[in-house]
Amino acid sequence: MRQLAIYGKGGIGKSTTTQNLTAGLVERGNKIMVVGCDPKADSTRLLLGGLAQKTVLDTLREEGEDVELDSILKTGYAGIRCVESGGPEPGVGCAGRGIITSINMLEQLGAYTDDLDFVFYDVLGDVVCGGFAMPIREGKAQEIYIVASGEMMALYAANNISKGIQKYAKSGGVRLGGIICNSRKVANEYELLDAFAKELGSQLIHFVPRSPSVTKAEINKKTVIEYDPTCEQANEYRELARKVEENDMFVIPKPMTQERLEQILMEHGLID
């Protein structure tokens, strides 16, 4: 069983990328579980046909400790198992703790069955606080992929996440598997992301182009592969799935200084 965490700044398209990637992996004959670790709880919406899934934390609040697995785990597209950890009530508590509670509960309830090939954690990545770092810190996820684009803030976040990975890689077995570019159609985007990934000592594992097919599929509450399996974008996600499945480049990243990051941005025309 490979356990992967997908990080990236808010709004970058992590959840969309993760769900489309898992749809590609399931086509390749893999059994998959997706654990949403974002308080927005939208990490499994496209796999469940838009059903707002009840989160682990909501279920715990309503039902107390006595929770059955089938009340927090729903089966979605092509048998993908879907869980949302959810978040605390606004203004109270820590969302990171929710992730810890959820993963512990899934373990106790026997969700991690031997037939699973992949478990994905879709994690909010602007803040690499202890709770959100939990999938890396506790050695749950061995592989991290960062979703980024050619925008400055996306790369700042990706560099910060790399610092978190570097910190926990020394004690645990966590490694960076690569950067996934979710294109924003910024000038020189491919070259910039490729240079950024190489500077970290990693790779740009795939460049996902921007496409109206993604929005159309989302409006229809489906992944692109389910909604329009023959379109070009569906093949992009299949290619991403192949590259992730066959990936053998796992590194402890070398995060860069602010100055070096800005230098790379300047070299590729993002800062004048």
From Swiss-Prot:
Keyword Oxidoreductase: yes
Single Gene Ontology MF annotation: 4 iron, 4 sulfur cluster binding
Keyword tags: 4Fe-4S, ADP-ribosylation, ATP-binding, Iron, Iron-sulfur, Metal-binding, Nitrogen fixation, Nucleotide-binding, Oxidoreductase
CDD domains: NifH (cd02040)
Organism domain of life: Bacteria
Required cofactor(s): [4Fe-4S] cluster
Keyword Metal-binding: yes
Gene Ontology biological process terms from the UniProt entry: nitrogen fixation
Co-factor binding comment: Binds 1 [4Fe-4S] cluster per dimer.
Assigned EC number: 1.18.6.1
Entry-linked InterPro entries: NifH/chlL_CS (IPR030655), NifH/frxC (IPR000392), Nitrogenase_Fe_NifH (IPR005977), P-loop_NTPase (IPR027417)
Reaction(s) catalysed by this chain's protein: N2 + 8 reduced [2Fe-2S]-[ferredoxin] + 16 ATP + 16 H2O = H2 + 8 oxidized [2Fe-2S]-[ferredoxin] + 2 NH4(+) + 16 ADP + 16 phosphate + 6 H(+)
Modified residue annotations for ADP-ribosylarginine: R97
UniProt PTM: The reversible ADP-ribosylation of Arg-97 inactivates the nitrogenase reductase and regulates nitrogenase activity.
Broad class of enzyme this protein falls into: oxidoreductase
PROSITE patterns: NIFH_FRXC_1, NIFH_FRXC_2, NIFH_FRXC_3
Binding positions ([4Fe-4S] cluster): C94, C129
The protein's assembly and partners: Homodimer.
Xref: NCBIfam families: nifH
HAMAP family registered for this protein in UniProt: NifH (MF_00533)
Role: The key enzymatic reactions in nitrogen fixation are catalyzed by the nitrogenase complex, which has 2 components: the iron protein and the molybdenum-iron protein.
Family: Belongs to the NifH/BchL/ChlL family.
Protein name: Nitrogenase iron protein 6
Organism of derivation: Clostridium pasteurianum
Source species taxonomy: Bacteria, Bacillati, Bacillota, Clostridia, Eubacteriales
Name of the gene this protein is made from: nifH6
